[in-house]
């Protein structure tokens, strides 16, 4: 490993120990905001520190084994130990390289998840409902919180569009590769001939930004319409114009929010989603310019990005970006998504490593 990388790892390891000491300090414990910030930093440094400690131990083992090679009686055992230590050292070096990759500052943030029915009419709306349920199950398994911001239901079930905020540790970093086109192939319940229909939905995942980082939006650029909230009736039927539709005139981005009974709350929610959408559009534009020579696994949330196909008759799910096919569709639809997310995260890391080695 390069001396410059070892020096960087030593500095991070020292910082990890320093933060650990600070977390035990009474002054830090009394300041909740500082305690939370240091706890986050400690968690981020822990893997690097632990891996580096293991790597240092392996270097000591290699040195000891090399010294033992001079002893004829110990040579055979020393050769075995040396081979094992070198293999382990290589594995740890690879892990450390991944841990040192530049982190996306948005990865630890909450996220807005949008699922929209595309081509396919009622069947697309039903599939949008299935996708939202799939992500909700995944969130539940990871102890994330799902809050529906806005929903437009399909005529025969599912959703024409649904927007939810998902809160928890590392939500955006885990879900960001879901942005793009999702295609379903299955026989609709109304299909008497047993023909397979193809429908599509688009998914967009955007980080929730702190207020200070939201893009500046000129109020003159907004058209705000109020309307009566639709949805289930009953005793809580909404009789006031509390639902909000905000149109950002320069970009044409439209956000609706009708989940709350208060117009003020709906407006606040809609503005936060609008800010996230504008930020996401600006980021996508920048990434496109930067990655024009290299493939970009991070979808734009556009229907032209074909991420996955879910083929129900074959029980198959295919990720077209990395040519991954699994015959475990039922598990995926129940929210067991790590088997699909992990390979694309690893592929993204491999691309980042390749980009770094090109720079070097």
UniProtKB/Swiss-Prot annotation:
Q: Does the keyword Magnesium apply?
A: no
Q: Where is this region: Disordered?
A: 284-313
| Cross-referenced SMART domains | PCRF
Q: List the InterPro entries.
A: PCRF (IPR005139), Pep_chain_release_fac_I (IPR000352), Pep_chain_release_fac_I_sf (IPR045853), Prokaryotic/Mito_RF (IPR050057), RF-1 (IPR004373)
- GO MF annotation list: translation release factor activity, codon specific
Which residues constitute the signal peptide according to the record?
Answer: none
**Matching SUPFAM superfamilies, A to Z?**
Release factor (SSF75620)
Q: Which residues form a coiled coil?
A: none
Q: Where, subcellularly, is it found? A: Cytoplasm
Modification N5-methylglutamine occurs at:
235
GO terms under cellular component: cytoplasm
Output the PROSITE patterns linked to this UniProt entry: RF_PROK_I
Q: Which UniProt keywords apply?
A: Cytoplasm, Methylation, Protein biosynthesis
Protein family membership: Belongs to the prokaryotic/mitochondrial release factor family.
Function, as annotated, reads: Peptide chain release factor 1 directs the termination of translation in response to the peptide chain termination codons UAG and UAA.
Name of protein: Peptide chain release factor 1
Which organism encodes this protein?
Citrobacter koseri (strain ATCC BAA-895 / CDC 4225-83 / SGSC4696)
